Amino acid sequence: MTADELAAAVGAAAAHELDSALDRIKHCQGQLTDEQVWRRSAPGLNSIGNLILHLCGNLRQWVVAGVGGAPDARNRPAEFAERGPIPKEELLRRLEAVVEQAKGVLAGVDTRQLTEVRRIQGFDVTGVAAIFDSVPHFRGHTQEIVHMTRLQLGDAYHFAWAPATPEQGAPADKQRDEG
């Protein structure tokens, strides 16, 4: 594998992870009302809406601007100060747009971009470090959104996936007939 092939593989894997996490966020959002998206379990805690704004800001700053070279105009405090209700459809539109921008950067990333040190949010990092900071950060907050959705919905929560075969881990009484 050449260095360019490795750079392309890193970009493709990161883009796939963003798509997977975005699908989970969309799955959760589809089960919630605008009010639930902006609900805070305590005054000092974030809502799902705040987390989505935060994901937009972080991904834009670290990947789109930091790795891709776009201008960085992030206002991090505003991500957490917002009380909404920005409609959930608008939040998803914003998030999808930033994910697409990031995937565009990741699709064209080269070895120079991966190894070059740049300053992002006060940190001196390589491009690969920026990607491996931002993408797991995105997934972590995605899992937080899943958890917050499940807490609000309880037994009404619909899972995005459930095992159907023994290989996938389905209990014997829950296996689907494959015939």
Where do the model's predicted regions map?
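Short, contiguous alpha-helical
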Residues: 11, 15-19, 23-29, 34-78, ...
